[in-house]
Amino acid sequence: MSKVYDWFEERLEIQAIADDITSKYVPPHVNIFYCLGGITLTCFLVQVATGFAMTFYYRPTVTEAFSSVQYIMTEANFGWLIRSVHRWSASMMVLMMILHVFRVYLTGGFKKPRELTWVTGVVLAVLTASFGVTGYSLPWDQIGYWAVKIVTGVPEAIPIIGSPLVELLRGSASVGQSTLTRFYSLHTFVLPLLTAVFMLMHFPMIRKQGISGPL
């Protein structure tokens, strides 16, 4: 076993990486509120795992979406648990994200030299809210349908570009199959990809700059 480890160590310098991770200085003022970002990340990973599991059963069509969700909840093995964990972790992710933003703001974590860390964090907050909006519609029940209709209708108040923007969001003049397809694609592919990209920008900056000091 040691020979296998030595082989990888010689090529990847595993011990140096482990030492860098475990020996990072943590300021004495850090408390449990500095863990909110990590909890948000954990919730995101739970979302990815449970969401991926549900894609095996969910059908993104206006005629089958609701019945497929019912199948997940009543017939699929542990489907009720997976969907429930997905919903609970979604709520927890939004709550932890909001508290994390407040903590960073109140402790001055957005100030020089951490401006870019703050900007990427704000983008991640917007993406988190977008997850909620797009995911809410996927069961295609009465609540989801009317929520989508209201949300996608908001840009209509914008002069000149309002109507084209609404049609872009809905995929047509009215809410229907094109809308559900768009929201499903956003929720399961576009938003997770963008979130992963911005997290890969956000965390290395935190690692490089360290935790901000007390006010």
UniProtKB/Swiss-Prot annotation:
It is a multi-pass membrane protein. GO terms for cellular component: chloroplast thylakoid membrane. SUPFAM superfamilies: Transmembrane di-heme cytochromes. Gene3D superfamilies: Cytochrome Bc1 Complex, Chain C. The keyword Electron transport applies. Heme b 1 binds at H100, H202. HAMAP family: Cytb6_f_cytb6. The 4 large subunits of the cytochrome b6-f complex are cytochrome b6, subunit IV (17 kDa polypeptide, PetD), cytochrome f and the Rieske protein, while the 4 small subunits are PetG, PetL, PetM and PetN. The complex functions as a dimer. NCBIfam families: PRK03735.1. This is Cytochrome b6. The gene is petB.
